[in-house]
C-alpha cells in the first residue's frame, strides 16, 4: 500500500509498505480522506509532545471497514470515522472518565500509525458508523467538529452570549460554528490570513480582525458592545492568550483549545484574579463523535469552506508546504487517499 511517514523533523517519506494486519479487537480500514491538522504540522516540524518517529501521521480521517479481527463483523463494508485516542481503559485517568489523559495512551498518527495511507488499523471500539448521505469527504471533518464540541461544552456557551474566536484555522472555524449553533453570537474572529478571515465572515462572524497583538483590545475599547463573554483561543500563541485575558468581560470565560509547545512568553496574569475569570483547557474530541456526526449529517456545520486544497498522497510535499505557509488561500490541505 501507499503511505506517508514522518521519519524525522522536516523529513516526510512517501513509499509502499505491507498492508497492516488488524490485531484482535481491531479493524482494517480502507481510508478515504484525511485532512492535515495543525498538530500534524507541528509533528512534521518536530515541535510536538507525546510522539515517536517514524510514524504515519493523520487522525482526521474517514474510510470503509474491510476486515475485523474478532466481534464486529457487521461493520465490514460500512463507512466510518474514529477516535484517535486509544486508551488502556484500566489506569487511574481512564477510571476517572478522561481517556485522553490515559497513562498508557496511544494516539493514531502520533504514537501509532495513522491515516496518511491507503489502509490503517484501529480498535473497533473507536469506530463510529456514518449515516447514509454523509460523504467520506465531509466526514473527514468529524474529528475536528468533535474537538470543537468538546471545547465549547467545556467552557460553556449560553444563548445570546458574545463569543470571540482567536485563530481561524480548521479548529477555530469549527469553534465559531459550534458556538453559534449553541446560540452564541460570534462578535469577533481574529486571524492573520486574509482568506481565512473571509471564510469566518462568510460563516457569520460579525467582525474580523487581522490578529495583530492589541487589535482586539482596541476594537473592544471603541465598541464596548463587542466585549466578549467568552473567548475561544485556537491559535496557541501566548500573546493571544494574554489578549483574551485582557478583553473578556469581568467574570467571563476563556477556553484554551490551540497550543504550541515551542511558544513561550511573559503574561500579566493578574487580570485573571482581578476580573475573576474562569479559564478552561480542552484537549481532544472528548467522546463527542456521535454528536459531531449528527450535526454534519443535518447540515448544521459547514465543512466545504474549510476543505480548500485537495491532494493525492504522492503530492504530500506541496500539501505540507501550502499548509505550513498558509499560502494560496489555504484553510486546510486534505488528502484523497483513493486518488
Swiss-Prot record:
Lineage top rank: taxon: Bacteria
Pathway: Metabolic intermediate biosynthesis; 2-deoxystreptamine biosynthesis; 2-deoxystreptamine from D-glucose 6-phosphate: step 3/4; Antibiotic biosynthesis; tobramycin biosynthesis
EC number: 1.1.1.329
UniProt keywords, alphabetically: Metal-binding, NAD, NADP, Oxidoreductase, Zinc
Catalysed reaction equations from the record: 2-deoxy-scyllo-inosamine + NADP(+) = 3-amino-2,3-dideoxy-scyllo-inosose + NADPH + H(+); 2-deoxy-scyllo-inosamine + NAD(+) = 3-amino-2,3-dideoxy-scyllo-inosose + NADH + H(+)
Note accompanying the cofactor annotation: Binds 2 Zn(2+) ions per subunit.
Family membership: Belongs to the zinc-containing alcohol dehydrogenase family. DOIA dehydrogenase subfamily.
Name assigned to this protein: 2-deoxy-scyllo-inosamine dehydrogenase
Organism, as annotated: Streptoalloteichus tenebrarius (strain ATCC 17920 / DSM 40477 / JCM 4838 / CBS 697.72 / NBRC 16177 / NCIMB 11028 / NRRL B-12390 / A12253. 1 / ISP 5477) (Streptomyces tenebrarius)
This protein's encoding gene: tobE
Amino acid at each position: 500500500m501507499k503511505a506517508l511517514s514522518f521519519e524525522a523533523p522536516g523529513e516526510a517519506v512517501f513509499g509502499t509498505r505491507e498492508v497492516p494486519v488488524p490485531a484482535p479487537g481491531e479493524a482494517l480500514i480502507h481510508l478515504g480522506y484525511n485532512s492535515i491538522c495543525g498538530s500534524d504540522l507541528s509533528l512534521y516540524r518536530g515541535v510536538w509532545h507525546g510522539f515517536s518517529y517514524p510514524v504515519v501521521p493523520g487522525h482526521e480521517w474517514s474510510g470503509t471497514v474491510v476486515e475485523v479481527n474478532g466481534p464486529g463483523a457487521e461493520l465490514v463494508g460500512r463507512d466510518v470515522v474514529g477516535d484517535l485516542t486509544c486508551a488502556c481503559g484500566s489506569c487511574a485517568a481512564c477510571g476517572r472518565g478522561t481517556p485522553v489523559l490515559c497513562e498508557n495512551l496511544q494516539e493514531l498518527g502520533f504514537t501509532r500509525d495513522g491515516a496518511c495511507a491507503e489502509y490503517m488499523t484501529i480498535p473497533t471500539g473507536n469506530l463510529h458508523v456514518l449515516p447514509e448521505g454523509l460523504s467520506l469527504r465531509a466526514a473527514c471533518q468529524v474529528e475536528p467538529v468533535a474537538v470543537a464540541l468538546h471545547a465549547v461544552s467545556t467552557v460553556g456557551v449560553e444563548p445570546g452570549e458574545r463569543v470571540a474566536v482567536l485563530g481561524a484555522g480548521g479548529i477555530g472555524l469549527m469553534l465559531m460554528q459550534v458556538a453559534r449553533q449553541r446560540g452564541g453570537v460570534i462578535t469577533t474572529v481574529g486571524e492573520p490570513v486574509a482568506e481565512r478571515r473571509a471564510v469566518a465572515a462568510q460563516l457569520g462572524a460579525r467582525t474580523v480582525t487581522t490578529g495583530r497583538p492589541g487589535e482586539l483590545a482596541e476594537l473592544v475599547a471603541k465598541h464596548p458592545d463587542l466585549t466578549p463573554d467568552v473567548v475561544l483561543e485556537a491559535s496557541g500563541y501566548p500573546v493571544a492568550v494574554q489578549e483574551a485575558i485582557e478583553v473578556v468581560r469581568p467574570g467571563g470565560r476563556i477556553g484554551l483549545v490551540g497550543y504550541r509547545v515551542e511558544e513561550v512568553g511573559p503574561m500579566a496574569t493578574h487580570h485573571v484574579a482581578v476580573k475573576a475569570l474562569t479559564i478552561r483547557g480542552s484537549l481532544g474530541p472528548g467522546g463527542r463523535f456521535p454528536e459531531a456526526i449528527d450535526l454534519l449529517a443535518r447540515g448544521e456545520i459547514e465543512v466545504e469552506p474549510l476543505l480548500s486544497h485537495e491532494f493525492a498522497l504522492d503530492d504530500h510535499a506541496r500539501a505540507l508546504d501550502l499548509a505550513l505557509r498558509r499560502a494560496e488561500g489555504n484553510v486546510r490541505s486534505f488528502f484523497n487517499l483513493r486518488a
